[in-house]
Amino acid sequence: MKLNFYKLLFTVGILVTISCNKNLDTKPTQSIDQNSALNTSSDVLVALTGAYADLGSAYFYGGYPFVASELLANSGELNWSGTYQQFTQINNKAIPVDNSFVANTWLSGYTAINDVNNVLSALSVVDAAKVNKVEGEAKFIRAATLFDLVRLYAKSWNDGDPAANDGVPIILKPTSSITAESQVKRAKVADVYAQILKDLTDAEAKLPITNGFYASKVSAEALLARVYLQKGDYPNAASAANNAISNGLANGFSLKAVYSDAFPYNVSANTTEDIFAMQVTSSSGNNSFQTFFSANSRGDIQIDPSHIDLYETGDSRLNLFYSSGGSVFTGKFDYLYGNVHIIRLAELYLIRAEANFKAGTTTGDSPLNDINVIRTRASLTPLTSLELTLASILKERKLELAFEGAALHDIKRNQGNVALLPWNSPKLIYPIPQREIRANPNLTQNAGY
């Protein structure tokens, strides 16, 4: 989806870093009149395609933040042997403020946000038959981007007072040059979540129930479920997950019968399990999971036996592990042009199970039935009601979603530990990039940096 042709049309309208060998706080000030740049419906559709391209940057939904989440949450179940200093620092929980991966994730996120702000500012020229869909897709992208930014660069919702803790800047208007107005302060965590939920609620109302591989009503409901779960709003998390499951099953989505088929090799299309995925082909897109997890590529991340030991005998998910050169790797990401799975249907069953269990409800179905849907697909014996505990639910989630980028956020939500570090350690939060603080004096740094 990362089409350079479309990106070029927007580069002059965004604040981007000129060159990695120049001062990193220097950004271009050239701009174009956004009203003349987006003066037809076709212009806006091209802009929206560019937003998906930037969302799929290697430093964003192309995978780097998800790989980093797994490394930052790593307590020994992964072995990092790579030469990238930036990921070594993340794996060691010793991130300097000038870590370029951290800086580029921030930049990529706000580039995508600026893209969709351009789109949203020009809705008046969009064909009436398309305007709701365009607005919904743009707001989905903005919400998704803000959600991952606030989870990485700020305290988690349950760490102190979200109304007092600094989150990330909320930018809702296009930025084409550096002005005092563009130097935005960090909004509070609670305000960032409120904006995310507002955008997703609007997107859910405006998007078609299915939309090819673009954002849809079902993907908005799925992301709503993820957001509500992360902020501990369990009734709404269960409800949103149930909506996504019900609408998904009624419109062609389904769990693959065999777990490994959710991660196909030599297939570039979405599976029926992909609620939302970034598209990767031989000519466009990024799949950083493949880069770092696959023995077919760099293979910098190997799976430790301590992780393998967590699976029960007969668990079909074990079939995706393989040995190469004396190390064990996951086969989830072996295909170079495999799509990046952002939200799978399986996660929604896990969200509904956890949320219902914590809320003491059975919205849509019981936690026991939902967990057993996952276990049955993995060729495991169903749990009994006596065996169902929060720990058993979280274990199924850990194994089902292993290495897909959920590890750090799951630990924080459930107040676990990362080795000797508590869940709310400042070392488990990204620093605000130093180049951004130099460029914007209104930004404050996180504690511990």
Task: Describe these PLM feature segments.
Residues 84-153, 187, 200-210, 335-345, ...:
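Conserved, well-structured interaction surfaces
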Residues 43-46, 61, 72-89, 197, ...:
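Hydrophobic-face positions in mid-chain alpha helices that act as interaction patches
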Residues 152-194:
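Short coil/linker segments at helix-helix boundaries
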Residues 48, 113-116, 193, 200, ...:
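Inward-facing hydrophobic residues that define packing positions of alpha-helical scaffold repeats
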Residues 20-69, 439-449:
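Acidic, glycine-rich segments characteristic of secretory precursors and extracytoplasmic regions
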Residues 193, 234, 362-364:
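TPR-repeat structural position
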Residues 1-30:
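Bacterial Sec-dependent N-terminal signal peptides
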